[in-house]
């Protein structure tokens, strides 16, 4: 089973409260919402797991969830005044009746998807909000470790404490999800292998964490494998560090490394992590 962190953004203008609102969105899909006169109790924005395409011409904005499974919802946002936003997760049955809800004001919340639910919505409601600087909401299975949400997350797929070699495969997150490799390698491959996931929305912070990771692993013969031309550019600043870099043109095919994905890209890609791991294994066997 894949461990998937679904990521959603403030991209539903039809569901946004605009009366008297100053609204800004940048290329990273980060939103600034300002409205000092908005009455308490009004909904700033809502998302739904089901949409009537013929009416709204929009697809559902929330991922499908499994009945009876527990999840963690994390909100990346700064709210002024603090704790003045009220968040609600509402669950509905097949008749459209609300069967349960979770209301909270903190930026992290556990919840269980009811067994009878066929739809859910997420809302941000004003409790005296004047400004929100909003990045994203992340929804994941509850049992994932906390570090998996970081802007750079190193995920080991093969570890041998006696090996002095290490391969680190760098992957950009998809705009809609971070998909953690659902496999481990059992047999010896000549080096420790790690897949490093980089946030597309906050890549600068991700590379700062990557530099710290490299310094912490200076006792290893570290080889970094790049999977995109965009990562190649950032790795140009790593030449002074004690590591070897295999750039994307030598690691993946040209059609892939030239495919630069942004939030508004028409092309959707999911990294072929199995193929990249095989390429890294071959590198250490040569």
Language model region names:
Residues 1-286:
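Extracellular and organelle-lumenal recognition/adhesion modules and their flexible linkers in secreted
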């Amino acid at each position: 089973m894949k461990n998937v962190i679904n990521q959603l953004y403030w991209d539903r203008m039809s569901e946004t409260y605009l009366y008297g609102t100053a609204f800004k969105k940048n290329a990273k899909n980060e939103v600034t919402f300002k409205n000092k006169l908005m009455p308490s109790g009004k909904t700033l924005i809502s998302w739904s797991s089901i949409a009537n395409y013929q009416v709204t011409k929009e697809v559902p904005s929330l991922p499908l969830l499994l009945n009876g499974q527990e999840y963690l919802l994390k909100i990346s946002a700064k709210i002024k005044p603090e704790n003045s936003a009220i968040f609600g997760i509402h669950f509905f049955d097949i008749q459209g009746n609300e069967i349960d809800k979770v209301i909270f004001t903190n930026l992290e919340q556990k919840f269980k998807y009811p067994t009878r639910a066929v739809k859910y919505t997420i809302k941000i409601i004003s409790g005296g909000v004047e400004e929100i600087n909003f990045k994203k909401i992340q929804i994941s299975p509850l049992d994932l470790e906390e570090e998996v949400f970081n802007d750079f997350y190193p995920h080991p797929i093969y570890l041998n404490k006696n090996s002095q070699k290490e391969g680190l495969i760098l992957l950009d997150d998809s705009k809609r999800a971070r998909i953690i490799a659902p496999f481990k390698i059992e047999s010896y491959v000549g080096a420790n292998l790690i897949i490093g996931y980089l946030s597309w929305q906050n890549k600068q912070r991700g590379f700062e964490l990557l530099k710290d990771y490299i310094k912490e692993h200076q006792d290893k013969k570290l080889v970094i494998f790049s999977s995109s031309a965009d990562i190649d550019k950032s790795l140009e600043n790593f030449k002074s560090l004690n590591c070897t870099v295999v750039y994307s043109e030598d690691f993946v095919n040209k059609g892939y490394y030239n495919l630069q994905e942004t939030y508004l890209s028409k092309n959707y890609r999911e990294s072929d992590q199995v193929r990249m791991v095989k390429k890294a294994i071959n590198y250490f066997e040569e």
